[in-house]
């Protein structure tokens, strides 16, 4: 089996995780107590969903996941919530004091006390796997736990499981919506280690997802539950090929191979379509071409940046439901002819996966049940916009050394700030260089021909 272990860190990571496991359970017909009436093989079984769930002798399905937070509230919600029987109590780990939006607390003082316990639990899950494929991390980098403990865990996982791939779903601070003043510090410090210790990081940002909920689902004031359920659809589409048997299946390592041209350039943009409310879906069933086009719209992007300002280096489209390769090829061909969607000249660009399992929606949720959906995850130079925005905010505060004493007081050195900031400046430069026309001399002749 090619198992995957999910690691949910901090409030953001756990709440996105909640939405994901809720959706996975629905997709596989697993009840909140872990029973799965449709599953006839008791025990390990070689069913595809066993990549994400392990089976006990009693026929209970337990997510291969660890949920960690430095303060107990969010974990307690799970311990008392609908899915309280789904997780093994040891998989939910909570500390007693908060990281208080402080990277240094999550990474040095408080995180250090809990990290060995977490790694021990992960080791138990790993021992339970026959062929561990890798890890999927869920966290946000604005707060203290997701950024600090998140980076610490990723660093330690690199040491313990060097060759296993690590895919991260990372919620970045939004341009307008801010939950903490020190978000830029935490994000920059955290990205510094994401650069080294993850293979692929999918960037999400609350504001972009808010706008999608508001615009496409007519939700006037979206809650985190609305946002997380939409994000869960993206994560579900990306992992569907690991959890179901399909025609064109995609492995975690395959994402990496197809999306990352250079090790540092591994921050991905994602989008999902169709996002329509139940009332609208009643009147329209969207074709493959339509959902493909909509997934390239700047408004569909789950991070605030405009792909029209950048070039695509690679693009992975995961279709699910009633989709045949012929339609996909036609849709992709149309995309390639569009002038607004530019690829770098050294990369042909598309990888496609098809999974015949139709998309599932949470009953009573906002999303409509549709026949087919697509999730696009792409590597575009436009994502540098996200970094430059955060870097700019970082610079404004750091020039005055505002709030820095909180970090230094928790055992960080001021040098780490400038080191992380320089690393990000280098990353912005890397993105710039990748986008510049590579084959010089050839470009001019092509212009003449046009």
From Swiss-Prot:
Q: Where in the cell is it found?
A: Cytoplasm, Cytoskeleton
Q: Does the keyword Iron-sulfur apply?
A: no
Q: Where is the active site?
A: 254
Biological process per Gene Ontology, one example term: microtubule-based process
Q: Report which reactions are catalysed by this protein.
A: GTP + H2O = GDP + phosphate + H(+)
Where do the annotations place GTP binding?
11, 71, 140, 144-145, 179, 206, 228
Disulfide partners = none
- Quaternary structure and interacting proteins, as annotated: Dimer of alpha and beta chains. A typical microtubule is a hollow water-filled tube with an outer diameter of 25 nm and an inner diameter of 15 nM. Alpha-beta heterodimers associate head-to-tail to form protofilaments running lengthwise along the microtubule wall with the beta-tubulin subunit facing the microtubule plus end conferring a structural polarity. Microtubules usually have 13 protofilaments but different protofilament numbers can be found in some organisms and specialized cells.
Physiological role? Tubulin is the major constituent of microtubules, a cylinder consisting of laterally associated linear protofilaments composed of alpha- and beta-tubulin heterodimers. Microtubules grow by the addition of GTP-tubulin dimers to the microtubule end, where a stabilizing cap forms. Below the cap, tubulin dimers are in GDP-bound state, owing to GTPase activity of alpha-tubulin.
The cross-references to InterPro entries, in alphabetical order and at most eight, read: Alpha_tubulin, Tub_FtsZ_C, Tubulin, Tubulin/FtsZ-like_C, Tubulin/FtsZ_2-layer-sand-dom, Tubulin/FtsZ_GTPase_sf, Tubulin_C, Tubulin_CS
What's its EC?
3.6.5.-
- UniProt entry keywords in alphabetical sequence: Acetylation, Cytoplasm, Cytoskeleton, GTP-binding, Hydrolase, Magnesium, Metal-binding, Microtubule, Nucleotide-binding
Q: Which Gene3D superfamilies match?
A: Helix hairpin bin (1.10.287.600), Tubulin/FtsZ, C-terminal domain (3.30.1330.20), Tubulin/FtsZ, GTPase domain (3.40.50.1440)
Recorded superkingdom: Eukaryota
Q: Which GO terms describe its cellular component?
A: cytoplasm; microtubule
GO molecular function list:
GTP binding; hydrolase activity; metal ion binding; structural constituent of cytoskeleton
Q: Which PROSITE patterns match?
A: TUBULIN
Instruction: Provide the cofactor list for this protein.
Output: Mg(2+)
Family to which the UniProt record says this protein belongs: Belongs to the tubulin family.
The chain residues annotated with the modification N6-acetyllysine are 40
Binding locations of Mg(2+):
71
Record PTM: Acetylation of alpha chains at Lys-40 stabilizes microtubules and affects affinity and processivity of microtubule motors. This modification has a role in multiple cellular functions, ranging from cell motility, cell cycle progression or cell differentiation to intracellular trafficking and signaling.
Full protein name: Tubulin alpha chain
């Amino acid at each position: 089996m090619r198992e995957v272990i999910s690691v949910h860190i901090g409030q953001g990571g756990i709440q996105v995780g909640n939405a994901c496991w809720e959706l996975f359970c629905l997709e596989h017909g697993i009840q909140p107590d872990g029973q799965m009436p449709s599953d006839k093989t008791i025990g390990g079984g070689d069913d595809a969903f066993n990549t994400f769930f392990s089976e006990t002798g009693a026929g209970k399905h337990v997510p291969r996941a660890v949920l960690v937070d430095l303060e107990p509230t969010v974990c307690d919600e799970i311990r008392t919530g609908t899915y309280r029987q789904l997780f093994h109590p040891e998989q939910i780990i909570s500390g007693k004091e908060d990281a208080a939006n402080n990277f240094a607390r999550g990474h040095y003082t408080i995180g250090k006390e809990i990290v060995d316990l977490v790694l021990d639990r992960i080791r138990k899950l790993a021992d339970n796997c026959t062929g561990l494929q890798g890890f999927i991390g869920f966290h946000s980098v604005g707060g203290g736990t997701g950024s600090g403990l998140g980076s610490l865990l990723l660093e330690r996982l690199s040491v313990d499981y060097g060759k296993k791939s690590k895919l991260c779903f990372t919620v970045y601070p939004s341009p307008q919506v801010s939950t903490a003043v020190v978000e830029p510090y935490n994000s920059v410090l955290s990205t510094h280690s994401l650069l080294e210790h993850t293979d692929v990081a999918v960037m999400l940002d609350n504001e972009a997802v808010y706008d999608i909920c508001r615009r496409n689902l007519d939700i006037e004031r979206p809650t985190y539950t609305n946002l997380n359920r939409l994000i869960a659809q993206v994560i579900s589409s990306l992992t569907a090929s690991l959890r179901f048997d399909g025609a064109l299946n995609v492995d975690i390592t395959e994402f990496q191979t197809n999306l990352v041209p250079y090790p540092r350039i591994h921050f991905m943009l994602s989008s999902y379509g169709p996002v329509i409310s139940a009332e609208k879906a009643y009147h329209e069933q969207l074709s493959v071409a339509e959902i493909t086009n909509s997934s390239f719209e700047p408004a569909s992007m789950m991070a605030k940046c405009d792909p029209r300002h950048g070039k695509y280096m690679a693009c992975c489209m995961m279709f699910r439901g009633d989709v045949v390769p012929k339609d996909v090829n036609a849709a992709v061909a149309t995309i390639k002819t569009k002038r607004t969607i530019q690829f770098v000249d050294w990369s042909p660009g598309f990888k496609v996966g098809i999974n015949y399992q139709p998309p599932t929606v949470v009953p009573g949720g906002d999303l409509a049940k549709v026949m087919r959906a697509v999730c696009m995850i792409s590597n575009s130079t436009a994502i540098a916009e996200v970094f430059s925005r955060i870097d700019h905010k970082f610079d404004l505060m750091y020039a005055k050394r505002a709030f820095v004493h909180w970090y230094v007081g928790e055992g960080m050195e001021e040098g780490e700030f400038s080191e992380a900031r320089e690393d990000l400046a280098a990353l912005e430069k890397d993105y710039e260089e990748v986008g510049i026309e590579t084959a010089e001399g050839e470009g001019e002749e092509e212009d003449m021909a046009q």
